[in-house]
Design a protein with these regions (language model features):
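Phosphate- and other anionic-substrate recognition elements at nucleic-acid/protein interfaces
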Residues: 1-124, 129-158
């Protein structure tokens, strides 16, 4: 059975923690614990947080590939993105949303150690959402944005 593809992002105070167990303990004090998956993303989240705080007037939007695929399909996805069936399911969704089959197949079937087909497919889904946003066709989640303690918008564009 497929699990949720979306996990809670850590709060800003967690970004300064150097140890997973301490970060998890702190996170639990303010709600949910911190998953290992979230913890492994901390360096990139920290880097992005610095960019967002330093470039407040720049339009930087958040999105999520699994929500993009769900919106393209009009339904929940059936398979995990890293499974063969999941790659095929997502490839077909992209093809049905105006991506060329030859383009998708070329990159999905590459056999390169450092290259993961699901990362390429996710990038295509994010491109789809970015194009919708540029054209004013995006789905906003939530409809009305909220802002964090630094005044940074908390809303995804799908």
């Amino acid at each position: 059975k497929r699990k949720s593809s979306i996990f809670n992002a850590p709060s800003r105070m967690i970004l300064e923690e150097k140890d997973y167990s301490e970060a998890n303990k702190l996170s639990k004090q303010f709600g949910l614990g911190l998953s290992k998956q979230s913890w492994n993303l901390i360096p990139k989240i920290r880097e992005l947080d610095l960019i967002l705080r330093s470039k407040r007037k720049t339009k930087i939007y958040e999105s999520h590939p699994e929500l993009s695929f769900q919106e393209m399909k009009g339904a929940f996805l059936e398979f995990k993105k890293k499974d063969k069936e999941g790659v095929k399911e997502r490839s077909n969704i992209l093809i049905h949303n105006n991506f060329k089959a030859s383009f998708i197949d070329e990159f999905v079937n590459k056999n390169i150690k450092e290259y993961k087909p699901d990362d390429f497919i996710d990038a295509c889904a994010l491109f789809w959402s970015a194009k919708r946003t540029i054209n004013g066709l995006e789905l906003n989640i939530p409809d009305q944005p909220s802002f964090d303690s630094e005044g940074i918008i908390m809303q995804m564009k799908i």
